[in-house]
């Protein structure tokens, strides 16, 4: 298995698909990485040479924030919003939708299960 950005990427998949296993890299970014490193999109990870893997690894390290650093950056941004007490921070703190979606009928996933007491069974 090739190890890129601290992630073991699957060897039997195409390079573009395998790169998406890294947090912070999607399909379009994986395509850009392959183009920049002059690697064919359809080649499998098994068929990559060590030189090509090192080129991909170095390109990602130099140009993108991925995995743990990206997770930390996102959580710090959310923490900053909650600390300054802005509206978006309050919505994060309360576990409600942040970007203006309606909550009267929707947002069940974001709000979580309702904490209503179960009615007692009649005898």
Curated annotation (Swiss-Prot):
Annotated GO MF terms: rRNA binding; structural constituent of ribosome; tRNA binding
Family matches, as Gene3D superfamilies: 1.10.8.50, 30s ribosomal protein s13, domain 2 (4.10.910.10)
Plastid among keywords: no
Keyword entries, A-Z: Ribonucleoprotein, Ribosomal protein, RNA-binding, rRNA-binding, tRNA-binding
Cross-referenced NCBIfam families: uS13_bact
A GO biological-process term: translation
Protein name per UniProt: Small ribosomal subunit protein uS13
Assembly and oligomerization: Part of the 30S ribosomal subunit. Forms a loose heterodimer with protein S19. Forms two bridges to the 50S subunit in the 70S ribosome.
Role this protein plays: Located at the top of the head of the 30S subunit, it contacts several helices of the 16S rRNA. In the 70S ribosome it contacts the 23S rRNA (bridge B1a) and protein L5 of the 50S subunit (bridge B1b), connecting the 2 subunits; these bridges are implicated in subunit movement. Contacts the tRNAs in the A and P-sites.
Alphabetized PANTHER family for the sequence: 30S RIBOSOMAL PROTEIN S13/40S RIBOSOMAL PROTEIN S18, SMALL RIBOSOMAL SUBUNIT PROTEIN US13M
InterPro entries reported for this sequence: Rbsml_uS13_C, Ribosomal_uS13, Ribosomal_uS13-like_H2TH, Ribosomal_uS13_bac-type, Ribosomal_uS13_CS
PROSITE patterns, per the entry: RIBOSOMAL_S13_1 (PS00646), RIBOSOMAL_S13_2 (PS50159)
Key word ATP-binding present: no
A GO CC term assigned to this protein in UniProt: small ribosomal subunit
Region Disordered: start-end pairs: 97-123
UniProt family annotation: Belongs to the universal ribosomal protein uS13 family.
């Amino acid at each position: 298995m090739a190890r890129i950005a601290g992630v073991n990427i699957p060897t039997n998949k195409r390079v573009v698909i395998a790169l998406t296993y890294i947090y912070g890299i999607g399909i379009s970014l994986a395509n850009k990485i392959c183009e920049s490193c002059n690697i064919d999109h359809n080649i499998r990870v098994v068929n990559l040479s060590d030189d090509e893997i090192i080129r991909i690894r170095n390109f990602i390290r130099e140009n993108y924030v991925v995995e743990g650093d990206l997770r930390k950056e996102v959580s710090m941004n959310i923490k900053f919003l909650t600390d300054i007490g802005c509206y978006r921070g309050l919505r994060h703190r309360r576990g409600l939708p942040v970007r203006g979606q309606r909550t009267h009928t929707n947002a069940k996933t974001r709000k979580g299960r309702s904490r209503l007491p179960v009615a007692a069974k009649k005898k």
